[in-house]
Amino acid sequence: MWCTTRRLGPTQAAFSITPSFRRGAGMCGPRSRSVLPVTSSWLLAAVYCCGARTTTISEATPWPCGNDTLGGSKPGAARFAAAAMECEDTSGLLQQQHQQRSGIATGHSGGGVSGHELQHSPGRTEQEDEEKTKAEGRRGGCRGDRRGGRVAGLQSAASVGRRDQGPILDAKTIKKYVTPLVIPPVMRTARCRTLFCGPRRVAKYEIAMRRFKQQILPGAHWNNPIWGILQEPLPENHTFGSTEVFGYGPAADPEPDSTALNGSLGLAPAANSQFNYPAYTVENTRFKPTSVDWINHLVENPWKCKWRWPRGPDCNFIKHIIPVDQSLHWANPGRLMCNPALNKTIDCRPSNVTDPELGRQYSGPVPMVVHVHGGHTDPESDGYPEAWWLPAASDISESFARQGTLVNQFGRLTNFRLGVANFRYRNDQPSATLWFHDHTLGMTRNNVYAGPAGFWIIRESGGRETGLVRGSLPGPAPRPGEGLLETNLPGKKGRDRLREIPILIQDRSFYENGSLFYPDNRAFFEELHPDQLQIPLIGNPENVSDIPRIWNPEAFFDVMVVNGVSWPVHKVEPDLYRFRLLNGCGSRFLNLALCVVDGSGAPCPLDSDGRPDPPEHELSFYQIGAEQSLLPKVVEVRTGFKTALPGNGFIPRHKRPASSPREALLMGPSERADVLVDFRGLKKGTVVRLINTGPDEPFGGFDPSVGIADENTTRQVMEFHVVHDTKVGNDATPPEHLKLRLPDANDPANLVWRQPAVVTERRDLALLEEDSEEICSTTEADGAIVWDPEAEPNPEEPGTCRLKGSNASTVVSKPFGPKAVLLGINGSSVDFRRTLWEDPIVTNPKKDTTEIWEFWNWSEDSHPIHIHLVKFRVISRIRFNTTTAMLAEKSEPAVPTEAGWKDTVIAYPGQVTKVAATFDIEGLYVWHCHVLEHEDNEMMVPYCVGPKSSAPGCDVVP
């Protein structure tokens, strides 16, 4: 079916017809505007193309979007649906339009996720419907047909992957629950050398990033019964090759050799080497600093190339294993020409958009810089995106920049060696679950997708927990000095004793040869074959474009990878367990639940709200902590409910409803959840599956019209198998008896994280999307997107196109998009000013002050917003009218699972999300969306704490 809507002006509304490709999507697509204007005062006017005949339906009620689309309660929706059934052929009107103006077909549908219905307001009045409709007109139409870049959407199309890798692997052919959950051991510290020892209280590491192979899919050493999962090896047709990854490990470690485990030389995980994906865990003690030499060792043979003295062909650089787009604002070590006015040759956006080089993948040495996410860290060690460095390779051209603009802020660090940077971490914050990952400007998504990431855990001395008033938590966790086998082999001295386990969840896709798949063209996001995306892209020498050729606005993959293994299984006792969960996906929001299944591999039955059916088959999560601390109360989380426990030994019978009946343990990218799971009372042989009921597309809230993840792939995450009838040796306190509190601001030990009572500044910050300023396109009947060379985006009326050289706005084509996702500064009403990475800094908190930041989300997606340096409290959310910027009468407080200290928060579409943070270290930091594809294309900007002199690059605008 075809439909779209946009606002032409205060007394005009125009609706038109455009294809809808997404299963379960609504009829309206904000990027679909084949326009035939109908003059009215916000009339509903749906124009149906039925051959050469048109049918118009008008009604004084607003256009039914979101939940009211197709079959909604309003008469207009029903009449629209009835008329839609009559439409069988649209070629008549399309041919007529094509004859009138060459190059124009139908409007392109590729907008946003359906379901921008505000998460905290499941019901709406008619007045609210009208306001919502007007808002959609302002933003360019109803949500409903954003394609979203899904591998699943390409399975029926021709191969869109790299030709040298072969076809993409169908995730449904991968056997599930035949590989063990790999529990990351603790990374060992470096041996102390006299020159580099530093203070004795400082934990010292030398951690390198190298290329190696990892067995992520079933096969190789996972076919070995030693892990206690398989009784006999899998047949050959259920095994897969290894995957080339980038990963971290101690620089002194040898090449992984898993030959004794049925693997091979060069294949991780291995007992002889701590190089692994994900990285082994870096354990830290509160108030004990940690010093890390981060080494870029991405060379041909890092095991033979001595990183301190690189010489010879073994030390030649390697190119990235993931396609890198050179047209973004990125590190640009090859110094492609940028805007001369900026006086920069690196860390900039190349300006010659017709240069064919910008359409090619970057093939030079790979830059890196590491960020400890959630760390209370000095700016020179925070992993600022312009503080990257290349490997000390022997064949890098002299024309390349070896380091980023700010690799040695303040001159405080000892970064005098190429290929290495020394970062120092205070660890002066409450015990928490942090993580570390790459943060290079414009290519974070590439580096993180390739593998380098790991847990960074802070504990109190003696293993205590900040904020635990009464009770004890499940343990033990993996201990320093234990290797892969001690941590992961079955037995009471191995994994069976562990009750605290970090779990990193990511989505990935693969070629049939086992290599990682990541899209190398924009057609992926449109779910088209590259030949069907017929528009100029950056790097086209004949036509100017502002659409990147390789970058995709979002990307969703079809294999769930947990701790570096596809769909693993973990055997548990009937006992209490503590899981430190991390959403490490690039774009995917997770909505996690626990479901008791029959063990046959069949999907977990769900009711219409996405709850396990029957309800007693769902196990609760007991969330005890968020990103930066324990919560003030244990929160029982079940699908549709989030109930704070009083801590007196009772679990309330009346549960507190969650923001949506479909909401379970919702986690945006980079959010963490510290949870307890109670397997006590479950019989031997019980199978508990961790499921994901989030969408396979960008998340905009729990709209019923948006489907949940594929039941055969991304809805399943991992399984827990109960293997004994009685628990063994765990004295953990049941969750209903635990008493927690937030870290006490009056405790002298917490002075560095004290929250001043006086708020000194309130900032309104905008979350935006931006369509092309150069390219107008239409969509043909087969879905192909075609350039309209005679049209240009109309700056007077955003979201529309006009004939070049004319003010006419009745053309069928529309601006192609999105070209970028942006941040901005809100004005007094609906005005906002976009801010780019290259712009002067406008956010300048004073040292030791507390500010309230309000994130106004004008876009169609939810965004996980991360602020470096600080912990913050989520204060409230409130809906706003995106036409008038008028706020709703009532705000809603943070949900119970957000009551602790956080560093990442979900900002929902059409809502203002309010947080409060204290800025206590001077210097240059960033804040950004943690959808990595957004972050890499302008949805990240710097901010500066303190005066302009506090750090290089703090060019603050008052």
Kindly label every feature range from the protein language model.
Residues 33-54:
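Cleavable N-terminal signal peptides of Sec/SRP-targeted secreted and luminal proteins
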Residues 142, 147-371, 376-391, 395-396, ...:
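N-terminal, post-signal-peptide metal-ligating segments of extracellular/periplasmic oxidoreductases
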Residues 218, 293, 301-311, 450, ...:
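Short, hydrophobic/aromatic beta-strand segments
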Residues 294-298, 581-585, 692, 855-859:
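Asparagine-centered strand-capping/turn motif at beta-strand->loop junctions
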Residues 298-300, 328-466, 643, 651-725, ...:
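Extracellular/periplasmic metallocenter environments
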Residues 596-600, 613-630, 858-897, 932-935, ...:
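Active/binding-pocket-proximal capping segment
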